[in-house]
């Protein structure tokens, strides 16, 4: 009898320490574990920002992994709205939305969305985008139905299957087969928000929609820390974030200790009944170009006045002129410190910046 082959898998939903006060995964350790698990690549999807992108890509290269740069955005109806009426029951309804860059254009569009989230959509500590921006900056981007905090799963959780289906159609119209149905399986989500629906119930609805619209299903783990034993320190991080006490029974916490960076074997066991959802992560992987984010540092070219042969000599002249004005006679200690600082600036090629 032929031995059954274990499905392949790459993580497409990962939070690092750059998901501020929410993620606890060190990028270097995450890359090491991905390599040890013989994964071909890994995604970066921090909350609302791409602060870790350069470090992420550099570390992936060290371990011969493909870096898949993305972001889990905060999606709202109107990014400009900052006033909400309690009397009318209004609140800032933020949904999670996972996006990945397929190529250089996609990376540039993700960067634009991130920037506009802060510039135009910042409310409290949340950089927010809306569908108006997505209509403008969606080229080169892959999207998923995301986690239970996303708009489509939330519609399902609250019993509005028609809304969920219409949202799926909106994404398909926008992205075609670059939109994927994402399913997750975390313990402790058997009765979400006390509404009598479980994460698995949500998954089954999503799978039915995927079949109806011929969409690929991908399996993910909402990774926020590296290993299972990191759940406890991560819980402390959440307390710092929310101001809650570790002893408070009613504070915000994750549903279980399963939000870690699982190995391929652990994911295969969790999704043994739908192995194609694991293999489909490679379908996403194959679509994504390997990003090269290294580039020369762009610094101003400062015009050098006559009598100086380089920015180095002119900066040195100005520094010593200023030091004499400030200190009068220069001691050996001051001279040594000035030369030390000037050497660092020169070695880095930052003379034009300081001038």
How does the language model describe each region?
Residues 1-355:
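Phosphodiester-processing cores and adjacent nucleic acid-binding clamps
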């Amino acid at each position: 009898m032929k031995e059954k082959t274990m499905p392949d898998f790459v993580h497409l939903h990962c939070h690092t320490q750059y998901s501020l006060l929410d993620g606890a995964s060190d990028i270097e350790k995450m890359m090491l574990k991905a390599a040890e698990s013989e994964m071909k690549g890994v995604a970066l999807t921090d909350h609302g920002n791409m602060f870790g992108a350069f470090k992420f890509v550099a570390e992936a290269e060290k371990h011969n992994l493909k870096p898949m740069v993305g972001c889990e955005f905060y999606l709202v109806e109107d990014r400009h709205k900052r006033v909400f009426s309690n009397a009318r029951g209004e609140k800032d309804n933020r949904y999670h939305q996972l996006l990945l860059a397929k190529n250089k254009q996609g990376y540039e569009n993700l960067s634009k969305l991130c920037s506009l989230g802060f510039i135009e959509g910042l409310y409290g500590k949340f950089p927010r985008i809306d569908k108006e921006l997505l209509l403008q900056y969606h080229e080169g981007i892959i999207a998923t139905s995301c986690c239970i905090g996303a708009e489509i799963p939330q519609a399902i959780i609250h019993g509005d299957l028609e809304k969920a289906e219409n949202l799926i159609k909106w994404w398909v119209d926008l992205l075609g087969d670059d939109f994927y149905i994402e399913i997750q399986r975390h313990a402790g989500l058997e009765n979400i928000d006390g509404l009598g629906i479980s994460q698995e119930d949500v998954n089954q609805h999503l799978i039915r929609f995927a079949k109806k619209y011929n969409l690929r299903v991908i399996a993910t783990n909402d990774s926020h820390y590296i290993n299972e034993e990191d759940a406890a320190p991560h819980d402390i991080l959440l307390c710092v974030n929310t101001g809650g006490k570790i002893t408070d029974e009613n504070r915000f916490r994750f549903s279980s200790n399963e939000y870690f960076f699982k190995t391929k074997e652990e994911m295969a066991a969790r999704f043994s009944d739908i192995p194609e959802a694991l293999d489909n992560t490679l379908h996403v992987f194959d679509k994504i170009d390997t990003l090269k984010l290294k580039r020369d540092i762009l610094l101003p070219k400062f015009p050098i006045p006559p009598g100086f042969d380089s920015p180095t000599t002119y900066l040195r002249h100005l520094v010593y002129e200023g030091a004499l004005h400030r200190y009068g006679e220069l001691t050996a200690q001051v001279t040594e410190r000035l030369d030390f600082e000037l050497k660092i600036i020169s070695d880095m090629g930052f003379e034009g910046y300081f001038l």
